Amino acid sequence: MKHIRIIATLVLMAVLSSASVAQMVSPVDFMRYNPRALNANPAFYTTDYGFFDLMLGGYNIGVQNIGLKYDKFFRFNAAGQPTVLDLDKGVASLRDKNYLNTYINVDIFNCGRRTKHGYFTYSHRFRELESLSYNKDLVKLLANGNAAFLGENNPADINIGVSARAFQEFAFGYQMSLTEQWNIGLRLKFLMGFMDAKTNAMNVKLYTDPETYALKLMTTANVQATLPYEFVMEDGKMKIVDRRFNPATLFKNYGLGVDLGGEYIINEHWGVAAALNDLGFIKWNNHSVNFVGEINDGGSFYDNGAFVFTGLTNEQVQAIMDDEHFADHLMDSLTGYFNLTPQNVAGYTTGLYTNLMVRGYYDLDATNRFSAQFMGYNLGMGMKPAVTLAYTGSFKEQYDVVATYTMMPGSFDNLGIGLSANFGGLLMYVATNNIFGFFNPANRTNLNVQFGISFTSGEKVSRAETIIIQDQAAEGE
């Protein structure tokens, strides 16, 4: 049963832990005087001569829930208090495929400096992402039982997907102004994996006989994982050898990634930008295992690869109620039908959660900018689109005020705000992609907060001045 508990732990991590995603939409992405905007587009032009931060530079924490909502499962009185639990209403509100995602990015160290050849950056970040997907049939079965699947809905067809990943990222970036209109950017990433888990398949079919009400259960499960602890296989079971984490093992889970970006200023009012982030892979070599699930022939309930339950006799029911040892023995017998076999594997490769960003903007004047952006982002369960409209107010080359509105599948109430201020070289910022999430989190799709402190140095450098410096450097060579 230990390997089953390990699988359950991995699933629980996907539901409860924090995690980081490939770049999510944030008001910080639209700031003009905050070098953190480089995270969204490596071609972003920063007027700062240099910046650095240690541990306090950036935290991005959030939850995305496209599925279960508190207010969908209750009826409320005139005072707004829940009075009746309405499971049918809650199930009807669900999509065919639902998601629960959590993420966290922690910037450990960042720095950047302008030279005569361009702008160079370095960053060290810890990133983590967990994503759980589930279909409506899972909640419907839990809420209404198997009776809800008689007739044309037979069988209950349950699909669950889990994706969990944690790694460190070391990134070297370069941004260059080709002309006063063209900016390009490149960021190379070296990755060190901590842990990974993903379901290649997790399906349960529960068929109810319309006449006898006998239950027929068929399962398919395949989970690949890389664990942070050393383990050995003994008698077909996985045993953790040492629960102490060894940092040297990080070098065995290695990867490479790249971010590409560009910006073109059409005229004094209009501009466009695009970026492709997190294009790459991680090779998981350390403590890798593959779990394969199937129905075992454990006795009379087994039938051609399925578990068939026709009920208990009156004597068995009475024995369960009267004899604790009999009940324990029966449960052990039933669990013998369900097997998750761990298989030691040499390793496997996973791609990063790549995302594409395309943006257009209009500068009313030097202070006010209006933007429209499309982003296709990946949470480990496929590419999802997000469309964002944004306003940026930038003042005195020190302050940014940003308001965003983002639409994505199943979520249309995302109003974000962001503030950034530079006080004599001390830059502080705070932002959220959905201010409503703080007032009613149980009923919101997104809950997010992003904040940090950096130190900037040197005089501000305009694009025109940068071009002159780069041209002079080229002539000198």
Predicted regions and their residues:
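Transmembrane beta-strands of outer-membrane beta-barrel pores
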Residues: 58-62, 126-130, 190-194, 276-283, ...
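Residues on the lipid-exposed face of transmembrane beta-strands in outer-membrane beta-barrel proteins
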Residues: 42-44, 104-113, 122, 170-178, ...
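Transmembrane beta-strands of outer-membrane beta-barrel proteins
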Residues: 52-55, 120-122, 184-188, 272-275, ...
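Outer-membrane beta-barrel translocator/channel fold
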Residues: 68, 96-100, 133-166, 226-232, ...
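Outer-membrane beta-barrel channels and translocator barrels
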Residues: 47, 115-118, 179-181, 267, ...
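N-terminal, post-signal peptide beta-strand-biased segments of exported outer-membrane/organellar beta-barrel
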Residues: 19-128, 132, 196
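Residues that define the transmembrane beta-barrel architecture of outer-membrane proteins
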Residues: 36-38, 102-107, 164-170, 254-258, ...
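Solvent-exposed loop/turn segments connecting transmembrane beta-strands
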Residues: 31-36, 350-354, 365-369, 373-388, ...
